[in-house]
């Protein structure tokens, strides 16, 4: 279990706390949904969990031990909003192998099969994939790292409805083997596979209730 205890974050240039004593328990194979208005701190929370930025107060505990930002970067795989903007390889194959001295072809094949890309041409550029396929590729890149937690920031942003459903099906397909945290403005897409849903309001993380929609 990963546990966040009273996490507080305030940007150096701001005078308001983006996150104020946020606590959250994430159990193995759960899918956690986090919603909230734009600018409410959802992406910031993912970046703290994944070790990309450091919080000022509070603790993050993994298997009853405090974990620092460097350790969390190993624990977590994060797929940013519009991940296709960050592709660096000239081909899909090079994109998948980027950063590895060596990686088994069997592992790549297995991960591509999990995300529904088993039939793609690895010599093609990533730009030739559809929007939904590019999101699947971004997830595959993170799954190759075998992370304990997969963090998805607005995974359906900018996609048409059919591609949104493509991403929903992907999350559904990998949910049995992965612990996933999804930040989204479209919670209705993922509610059938969600374990818990939270909303960020004025820096506070609150377990979702029906009356919070008002």
Which residues does each PLM region occupy?
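Helix-to-loop junction immediately C-terminal to a conserved catalytic motif
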Residues: 50
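Conserved ABC ATPase "signature" region
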Residues: 105-120
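ABC ATPase C-loop
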Residues: 142-143
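Catalytic Walker B motif of ABC-type/P-loop ATPase nucleotide-binding domains
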Residues: 150-154
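Conserved H-loop
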Residues: 178-184
């Amino acid at each position: 279990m990963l546990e966040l205890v009273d996490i507080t974050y305030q940007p150096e240039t701001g005078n308001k706390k983006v996150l104020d004593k946020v606590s959250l328990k994430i159990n193995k194979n759960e899918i956690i949904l986090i919603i909230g208005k734009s600018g409410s701190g959802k992406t910031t929370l993912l970046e703290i969990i994944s070790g990309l930025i450091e919080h000022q107060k509070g603790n993050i505990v993994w298997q009853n031990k405090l974990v620092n930002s460097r350790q969390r970067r190993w624990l977590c795989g994060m797929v940013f909003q519009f991940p296709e903007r960050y592709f660096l390889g000239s081909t899909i194959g090079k994109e998948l192998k980027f950063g590895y001295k060596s990686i088994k072809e069997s592992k790549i094949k297995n991960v591509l099969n999990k995300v529904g890309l088993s039939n793609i041409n690895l010599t093609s550029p990533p730009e030739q994939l559809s929007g939904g396929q590019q999101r699947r590729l971004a997830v595959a890149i993170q799954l190759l790292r075998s992370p304990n937690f997969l963090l998805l920031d607005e995974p359906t942003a900018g996609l048409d409805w059919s591609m949104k459903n493509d991403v929903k099906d992907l999350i559904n397909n990998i949910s049995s083997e992965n612990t996933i945290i999804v930040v989204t403005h479209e919670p209705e897409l993922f509610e059938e596979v969600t374990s818990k849903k939270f909303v960020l309001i004025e820096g506070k993380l609150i377990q979702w209730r029906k009356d919070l929609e008002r």
